[in-house]
């Protein structure tokens, strides 16, 4: 067809063909007219089977580009408007928006650092876990040192003013199973003395040696785990009295008092520690053995049992967040945080098909101005 003088656009194909309307192009290449118009509006071109179709202007009669003969001419003004819109898009320049950094007003910053499931005297031979992990007393010491150094880095970076250091138990493995009596690298008492020295050294580092000018307050929460018990079964009313960890926490507290290390201690005579934060939040800390083993064997993993525990506690305590350990897996939900472990993968995890996880501990930073969590970090210990 001949070009219409009132229709000064053409579609030029990369194969040399020329089309004078979207309808003509659609009929010639058997494509949907709406799709072609949309691509012209959004991209300024249309592509099919390796051929690119581009909008151009008709200059004059001397244009020698091959014209495809189309029997049907443009019969409505709408198609002409489609050309104009598509052409307009291709000719518009980019608009540059100015971006200006701004500083958010900040409130009182406090962080919860979880410390649990170190099992420092337990032995993990690489061969027993297909070389996914190795663990012994020396590696445990190294990982705990790394934890405190990395924790100090987080506190400095986040300008934290108050630290809630929550030791959630199972720092030692103890002798609760015959297998542990045969394979542990230390007795429970030896492991307790080793663990209390490592934890005290880490707290001392945070208070005196790390460069943390913003950190004004440290609150220590000490929860006993199930591995540190001296009884065959867990005892609920007086379990703390029969735990190596409760003795360990008392020793750490006394040493801090003797050396004037400014740390507030809360060592409950209960399975739970319930504290209030500066912005009136209620936090519950527990080891996690309150969730029975059935909570990890389902398709949904720990989540159903964890949510049930959260709901049960909420009826009584109206807590904002529950923090637990025990499961050696980092889990975060809107109402609960499950800590990872320092020991990482062992033969028990392999036998039960648990997911592998690097040695890590949870760290959650809060800002009173925001009214909730500012950020969550994983503190890696390896």
Task: Go through the PLM ranges and name each one.
Residues 238-246, 253-262, 267-271, 279-381:
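Conserved beta-sheet core of the metallophosphoesterase superfamily
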Residues 32-44:
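Major-groove recognition helix of helix-turn-helix-like DNA-binding domains
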Residues 118, 127-129, 135-137, 174-266:
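Active-site neighborhood of divalent metal-dependent phosphoester bond hydrolases
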Residues 3-20:
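Short, amphipathic alpha-helical "recognition" segments used to contact nucleic acids or chromatin
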Residues 44-63:
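Short Lys/Arg-enriched helix C-cap and helix-to-coil transition segments
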Residues 61-200:
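N-terminal active-site segment of His-dependent metallophosphoesterases
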């Amino acid at each position: 067809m001949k070009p219409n003088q009132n229709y000064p656009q053409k579609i030029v194909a990369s194969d040399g063909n020329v089309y004078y309307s979207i309808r003509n192009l659609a009929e010639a290449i058997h494509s949907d007219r709406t799709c072609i118009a949309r691509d012209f509006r959004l991209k300024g071109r249309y592509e099919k089977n390796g051929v690119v179709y581009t909008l151009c202007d008709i200059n004059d009669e001397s244009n020698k580009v091959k014209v495809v003969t189309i029997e049907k001419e443009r019969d409505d003004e709408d198609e002409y408007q489609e050309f104009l819109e598509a052409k307009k898009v291709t000719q518009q320049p980019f608009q540059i928006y100015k971006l200006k950094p701004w500083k958010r007003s900040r409130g009182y910053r406090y962080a919860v650092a979880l410390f649990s499931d170190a099992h420092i005297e337990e032995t993990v031979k690489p061969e027993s876990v297909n070389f996914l992990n190795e663990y012994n007393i020396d590696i445990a010491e190294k990982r705990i040192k790394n934890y405190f150094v990395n924790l100090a880095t987080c506190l400095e970076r986040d300008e934290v003013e108050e630290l809630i250091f929550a030791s959630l138990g199972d720092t030692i493995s103890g002798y609760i199973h015959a297998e542990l009596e045969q394979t542990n690298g230390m007795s429970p008492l030896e492991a307790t003395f080793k663990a209390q020295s490592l934890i005290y050294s880490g707290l001392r580092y945070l208070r005196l040696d790390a460069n943390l000018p913003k950190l004004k307050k440290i609150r220590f929460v000490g929860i006993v785990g199930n591995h540190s018990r001296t009884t065959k079964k867990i005892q609920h009313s007086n379990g703390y009295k029969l735990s190596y960890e409760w003795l360990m926490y008392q020793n750490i507290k006394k040493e801090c008092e003797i050396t004037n290390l400014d740390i507030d201690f809360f060592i409950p005579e209960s399975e739970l520690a319930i504290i209030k934060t500066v912005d009136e939040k209620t936090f519950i800390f527990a080891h996690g053995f309150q969730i029975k083993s059935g909570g990890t064997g389902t398709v949904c993993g720990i989540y159903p049992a964890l949510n049930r525990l959260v709901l049960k506690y909420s009826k009584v305590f109206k807590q904002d967040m529950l923090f637990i350990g025990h499961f050696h897996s980092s889990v975060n939900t809107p109402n609960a945080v499950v800590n990872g472990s320092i020991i990482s993968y062992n033969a028990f995890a392999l036998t039960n098909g648990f997911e592998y996880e690097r040695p890590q501990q949870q760290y959650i930073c809060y800002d009173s101005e925001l009214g909730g969590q500012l950020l969550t970090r994983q503190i890696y210990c390896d």
